[in-house]
UniProtKB/Swiss-Prot annotation:
UniProt name for this protein: mRNA-decapping protein g5R
Record keywords, A-Z: Early protein, Eukaryotic host gene expression shutoff by virus, Host endoplasmic reticulum, Host gene expression shutoff by virus, Host-virus interaction, Hydrolase, Late protein, Magnesium, Manganese, Metal-binding, Multifunctional enzyme, RNA-binding
Lineage, highest ranks first: Viruses, Varidnaviria, Bamfordvirae, Nucleocytoviricota, Pokkesviricetes
Induction line: Expressed early and up to late in the infection cycle.
Active site: E143
């Protein structure tokens, strides 16, 4: 069994207009299903129902992109200008072997045509994979800055809070570890312009936004990743922290 670990930072603020706790969430620019397909994280020998389910979980635009059979365009949709030539060559050869050589993509297009509905782009807590010899907290801080543009001096880490969640997809165990931070007063205003921080963020992020608990619940119902079991306890911790702080 393979284990993949990601580490993130739940960063909160008190919205001074509505007196609600909010946290920063980022939205991926592509669906998890699309990423899994492009990186060949599936079995070509799996039953058709499993493959169709993967296409079901893509957005309509992603399915249309796959139907072009243009792997360069699919790859660019995820990586943009990031130079990962060795990985690209490896994944292209697998795509070519799986779908182009047998029948010039006819089976792939047929499977996509059987897909129904539309997947959603994932909202999640800023997180990422640790580098070699990097501590969990250092990783969380680095990933948060890379994805939001907010640097370390603008928030306070609350070291008493650390929470993790895991899930297993039949082949790989995914473990997410989260730390908690509170934004400094200077950035608590509701009109804080996150778009300025976002403009030069990494390619995988499409949006960044403050979300309260009601919004977190709404988002969780519309996607496969349920954020409430992580963000709910974090908000409760913040409430107690603010109560005793004052």
């Amino acid at each position: 069994m393979q284990l993949k670990t990601s580490i993130g930072l739940i960063t909160c603020r008190m919205n001074t207009q509505n007196n609600q706790i909010e946290t920063i969430l980022v939205q991926k620019r592509y669906s998890l299903a699309f990423s899994e397909f492009i990186h060949c994280h599936y079995s070509i020998n799996a039953n058709q129902g499993h493959l169709i389910k993967m296409f079901n979980n893509m957005t309509i635009n992603e399915r249309l992109l796959v139907k072009t059979l243009d792997f360069d365009r699919m790859w660019y949709h995820i990586w943009i200008e990031t130079p990962v030539y060795e990985l690209y060559h490896k994944k292209y050869q697998k795509f070519r072997k799986n779908w182009l050589l047998p029948d010039n993509g006819k089976k792939l297009i047929s499977l996509i045509n059987q897909a129904k509905g539309s997947g959603t782009l994932l909202w999640e807590i800023p997180k990422g994979k640790p580098k070699e010899d990097e501590s969990d907290l250092t990783c969380a801080i680095r990933e948060f800055e890379e994805e939001t543009g907010i640097t370390r001096e603008y928030y306070q880490i609350l070291p008493e809070f650390k929470k993790s969640m895991s899930y297993f997809d039949g082949k790989t165990e995914y473990k997410h570890i989260y730390f908690l931070a509170m934004l400094c007063k200077s950035l608590e205003e509701p009109n804080m312009n996150l778009s300025l921080q976002y403009e030069n963020r990494i390619a995988e992020i499409s949006k960044i936004s403050w979300q309260n608990m009601e919004a977190v619940r709404f988002i969780s119902k519309r996607q496969s990743l349920n954020l409430e079991p992580i963000i709910g306890p974090a908000f409760n911790f913040i409430k107690n922290y603010l109560r005793y702080k004052h």
